[in-house]
């Protein structure tokens, strides 16, 4: 049986694709899918996910990639992945996490579709910090100054300056 998840589908900014979570391969386990709105076969974007997992995903502003947050490789450890919207190999975006269960808490895609900004327990155990990585993978860069174990990064926003540069606050 094919079942759709409670996560609402998203339409790509260019209107070409729908991206959605569906239980289509193994009964009780979800996967992330895309399909051309004009027609065609659905393409699975993620591995089969453990039953009951929620998947947070976003489509890049240029409609080329889907970034998603889920514990795909290690149960109980949410991590960040990027995959071409038309299908292909997914790439883990986050660095090795500081602890188990470390985690990526959330993410934002830059308005230029070039980078992903994310909050994660990365360099210091049990401290959520702000990181940046290219949307197609590579080394992550920590954006905040050193934080002690008493503090975390909770909120942030990404935008463009009048000159077209990315700004994170």
Regions found by a protein language model. Give the residues of each.
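Low-complexity/repetitive intrinsically disordered segments
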Residues: 1-2, 32, 165-169
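Residue-level detector of Asp-centered blade-edge/turn motifs that repeat once per structural unit
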Residues: 13-14, 61-62, 111-112, 160-164
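Structural motif
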Residues: 27-33, 75-81, 125-131
């Amino acid at each position: 049986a094919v079942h759709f998840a409670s996560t609402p589908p998203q339409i790509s900014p260019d209107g070409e694709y729908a991206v959605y979570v569906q239980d289509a391969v193994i009964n009780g386990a979800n996967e992330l899918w895309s399909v051309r709105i004009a027609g065609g076969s659905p393409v699975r974007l993620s591995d089969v996910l453990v039953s009951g997992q929620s998947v947070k995903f976003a489509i890049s502003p240029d409609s080329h990639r889907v970034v998603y947050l889920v514990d795909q490789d290690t149960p109980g450890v949410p991590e960040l992945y990027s995959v071409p919207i038309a299908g292909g190999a997914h790439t883990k975006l986050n660095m090795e996490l500081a602890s188990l269960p470390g985690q990526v808490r959330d993410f934002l895609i830059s308005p230029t579709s070039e980078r992903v900004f994310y909050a994660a327990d990365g360099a210091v155990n049990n401290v959520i910090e702000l990181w940046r990585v290219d949307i197609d993978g590579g080394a992550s860069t920590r954006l905040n100054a050193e934080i002690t174990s008493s503090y975390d990064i909770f909120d942030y926003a990404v935008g463009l300056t009048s000159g077209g540069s990315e700004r994170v606050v």
